Amino acid sequence: MATARVSLILLVVVLAASACAEGLRLPRDAKFPAAQAERLIRSLNLLPKEAGPTGAGDVPSVAPGELLERRVTLPGLPQGVGDLGHHAGYYRLPNTHDARMFYFLFESRGKKEDPVVIWLTGGPGCSSELAVFYENGPFTISNNMSLAWNKFGWDTISNIIFVDQPTGTGFSYSSDDRDTRHDETGVSNDLYSFLQVFFKKHPEFAKNDFFITGESYAGHYIPAFASRVHQGNKANEGIHINLKGFAIGNGLTDPAIQYKAYTDYALDMNLIKKSDYDRINKFIPPCEFAIKLCGTNGKASCMAAYMVCNSIFSSIMKLVGTKNYYDVRKECEGKLCYDFSNLEKFFGDKAVKEAIGVGDLEFVSCSTTVYQAMLTDWMRNLEVGIPALLEDGINVLIYAGEYDLICNWLGNSRWVHSMEWSGQKDFVSSHESPFVVDGAEAGVLKSHGPLSFLKVHNAGHMVPMDQPKASLEMLRRFTQGKLKEEWLAELPEQPMYAAM
């Protein structure tokens, strides 16, 4: 306890010195995280209008540990959808007071034997329905609220599950605040528990290959979740889950490395000047120090690290103004940088709510309550659990759109190259090759053994939205174990870019 107090005092001294050097006035009110939630929830996803879902109303009751699922036909669907297996459901989380996890299941448009893929949107606290209708789900929403087929939906080659998590996200809810999650242990245990009951209800999928995917803050969720699944398999807990790999898109995984890359990326993209670069870099040493304390001293240190390190990003944003930090080629339009308003309109429709079984629950794209609850988790390093998975043959794909600032490809590339595992030396020395889709280079791929890194061209933070065809092809090759093989005969090797 004494060591923790001394460390925090040292952190305050370092931060104060850095702030004085920069002329920065730090917020003094005790409600700083709440204020930050409104300003910075956008830094990994969207600004919500409400704290979280409200008004459970006539949501069907379900016993703890049980799953209640219904076959779904959404209003506005195109013709022919009745032949497919679309489901929505609630899982009543055991060992909680009242927590219910909402999910969609879209069976493959191909065959039942296709892999099972689970998708996790980041935030923390942002609904996976954002991905369902704007990224890689079966449909897109038009302005008149009708749905159109997404021909590049990931359900064309997989049985895909979209989950609202942690509790309080999207349509997942609890009437008891004690069910709010604050760390990856709680999040991953909930997801593992859900999978056990899901595969019990759907034994036809239990032996299929299983992959975990997601983006943004899922760079935290996914390594912990994959480790929990692998641990359960090794301990023969319940149903064996046939985990083959996981893919993280533009994720936040190793904050110490990724925050340090902000200024380098911003300078490389001509977003800031060299003088700005030198000035903002003065925040890096206190950020690194704060993250070290977070790894040893717990919640108070982690909150301090969040405040210190985000001064790097906020300083850059003061200079870039209205640039869309999810895609620096674009301007930020309105509060959200993207217009996802049709999603909340769609889920505000009574017929839609009745179809998916959520009663009168009010849908919120992103929850400030969940965001604030996870602030002490933000600066933790989730890379540390990945090497053990690689050593056991779990395939890992880290991909990143090249125009994203907030979880940029450079920071992701650096932590992947820095990761210590038995294949690190060979991975670092391996050559990069073009990722070719329909005869054109869609990205640059580097692979060795079970580890791959893909830099995706002409894409920002949300690769499936910006490059739907390339992202679908990426998933197909990854799940079929062909990510490395298929480009070998297409184009010759090209020079590597430097990994720093």
From Swiss-Prot:
Substrate binds at residue 407. Its EC number is 3.4.16.5. Residues 1-21 form the signal peptide. Induction: By gibberellic acid (GA). Inhibited by abscisic acid (ABA). Monomer. It catalyses: Release of a C-terminal amino acid with broad specificity. GO terms for biological process: proteolysis. Residues 22-73, 485-500 form a propeptide. InterPro entries: AB_hydrolase_fold (IPR029058), Peptidase_S10 (IPR001563), Ser_caboxypep_his_AS (IPR033124), Ser_caboxypep_ser_AS (IPR018202). Pfam families: Peptidase_S10. It comes from Oryza sativa subsp. japonica (Rice). Belongs to the peptidase S10 family. Keywords: Carboxypeptidase, Disulfide bond, Glycoprotein, Hydrolase, Protease, Signal, Zymogen. The active site is at residues 216, 404, 461. Disulfide bonds join 126-366, 294-309, 332-337. One of its GO terms (molecular function) is serine-type carboxypeptidase activity. Glycans are attached at residue 144. This is Serine carboxypeptidase 3. One of its GO terms (cellular component) is vacuole.
